[in-house]
A protein has these predicted regions:
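Predominantly extracellular beta-rich ligand-binding scaffolds that present long acidic/polar faces
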Residues: 1-201
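Extracellular modular ligand-binding repeats in secreted and cell-surface proteins
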Residues: 199-222
């Protein structure tokens, strides 16, 4: 889905040209997503695919979570654990998922924007990710695939992923250990548990719970 403005004319509600010029026309819009949790797989074939919202041109997203899911973008760009593309604010959210896409793939957002239609830019702050990116042609990161927009106090756990497009940034996108992640007082329970699932012919053969950093013995593989 998207958080944006529908520009199609509504003849019943839209202000028409008959309104006198002595009246000042002013519009206000509000759009908030709060405490939304997604545990289901998301698949798209075009640009703007996200665990919570695909394209976010406006509004405010906070305290959301994607957990134990796969987010795939077959042919398009801008794939994110929380938002595919944001031109607004993404704050205080958690992402634990597997992602794939063509360009601009990020654990929190695929990319932000420098300047939106109303002159403002995106802000991505105080988010945490523990993700795996299995396929990306260009521009990937545990937080974002692009450094466009404002990034503040975002943190990620990864042995191989950069924070934002091949780099980590102090104060913007910093790596932390899993032990440090566990010290967060508001850490969702889903960030503390892991399940290994074996699938054959689209059927689950075996599922096993394990701790972060555990190794799997060959005898455990069906």
């Amino acid at each position: 889905g998207s958080m944006t403005i529908e520009y199609t004319l509504d003849p019943e509600d839209d202000v028409t040209g008959h309104l006198s010029n002595i009246y000042r026309k002013q519009y206000e819009y509000r759009s908030i997503i709060q405490k939304c949790v997604n545990t289901g797989d998301v698949a798209g074939k075009r640009s703007y695919v996200g665990g919570i919202v695909g394209r976010m041109d406006l509004g405010y997203l906070t305290a959301c979570e994607t957990s134990s899911c796969t987010i795939t973008n077959e042919n398009g760009s801008y794939t994110g654990g929380i938002a595919g593309l944001t031109g607004a604010t993404v704050h205080g959210s958690f992402s634990k998922c597997t992602l794939s896409g063509k360009k601009y793939v990020g654990g929190i957002v695929g990319s932000g924007v420098q300047e939106n239609v109303d002159g403002s830019g995106s802000t991505v702050s105080w988010n945490y990710s523990l993700v795996d990116i299995t396929d990306c042609q260009q521009y990937q990161g545990a937080i974002s695939g692009s450094d466009t927009g404002t990034f503040e106090h975002n943190y990620y756990v990864s042995d191989d992923l950069p924070g934002i497009n091949r780099q980590g940034y102090t104060g913007r996108a910093e790596p932390i250990s899993y032990a440090e992640l566990l010290t967060l007082p508001d850490l969702p329970e889903s960030m503390k548990s892991f399940t290994l699932t074996f699938v054959a012919d689209d059927k689950t053969v075996l599922s096993r719970a394990f701790n972060y950093g555990d190794s799997i013995d060959e005898s455990d593989i069906p």
